[in-house]
Every structure is written in C-alpha cells, then in structure tokens.
Amino acid sequence: MSTRERQISTTVLVIGTGGSGLRAAIEVAEHGIDVLAVGKRPRQDAHTSLAAGGINAALGTMDEGDSWQQHAADTIKESYLLANPHTVEIVTQGAERGIRDLERWGMDFAREDDGRISQRFFGAHTFRRTAFAGDYTGLEIQRTLVAKAEQLAVPILDHVYITRLLVRDNVVFGAYGFDQSDGTRYLIHADAV
C-alpha cells in the first residue's frame, strides 16, 4: 500500500459525487468559483444512479392545477408531519428549476406525443408530478450531471474516501481521506466545505 500524500487547495470542496454533490459543484462552477468534488465511488456509479422511479416537481405538464404549494403539502402529509416545513418549501419551490436544468443539459426525459415532459403518479401525490426516464431515471440524472460537470471542467476525484473533516475554532477548513484503490492520502484545504 502506498504511503504517498497529496495536498490540494481549493475554494470550495464538495464531498460526494452523487446527484446532490455534483449539482452543488456545478452551481459553484457556474459562478466562476474554484471547486473540487470528491467521491468514494466512480462518478458514474454513485448511488443516485440506482434510483429508478423518477424525480418530482410540480411542472403542471399533465395536471395544470399542480403547484409547488400542493407538492409541499403532499410531502409534509406523507412525512406524517415529521418533515421540516422550511426545508420542504425550499425543495418543492426549487424542484421545477432542477428539472429544467437537467432538461437543458440534455437529460432524456420521457415525453408525451406533443413534446411535454411526461409525469406520472407516484407515492402520495395529489397530481401527476413524477418526471422519469424509463426505469433508469437516477442513472440518466447521474450521466447528465457528470457530463455537465465535465463540460465545466469541474475536477472530480473518484475513489477517495473522506475520513475526517479538518476543523479549527469550530470552522471547517478542509478534509482528509484516502484513495481506496492505491492508499494515497489526501489532505484537502478549502475555504468552504
């Protein structure tokens, strides 16, 4: 096993290269900020790729009466009132933008004959709001996000398992981990993690 160590500095470190991590890294890169994404799995094989059912947003493509407010109400009800209402509001208000971003970046959503994104019922929804790509929605989301991150030249470290956050005076300033394939240690300093 190697005892090599790499030291890296970046403005923003994103830990995780699944859907959320890559989406965050893309947002940072689009604002012209130096970002590094680190994932313990190969970028094409993050857990997002296993999601099959679809992704929810009140687009109104199938049911014009749908809204982010109804999406939020359905989410809170289905959580048995355990979901944080503020978080639910943020997620449901931003869901349409997420779908539109994926669409703009080339995601191959299922479509109706007239070209609208197809949506179906899923879970406890009042309206049809699950957009999908066959039964491989998560894989298509992951492929789309990886392609966009690569287009923006976001550096991605695969197979690096983060074991420790670096903290001083209650401020996180980096992370420490190792490459699972060759043991190389990584010391990553960042202004934001």
For each predicted feature, which ranges?
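N-terminal charge/polar-biased segments
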Residues: 1-15, 19, 155
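N-terminal Rossmann-like FAD-binding beta1-loop-alpha1 element of flavoenzymes
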Residues: 11-37
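Anionic group-transfer/hydrolysis microenvironments
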Residues: 13, 41, 193
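Residue-level recognition of conserved structural "scaffold" positions that shape functional pockets
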Residues: 23-25, 60-61, 130, 190
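Short, hydrophobic/aliphatic alpha-helical segments
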Residues: 32-43, 190
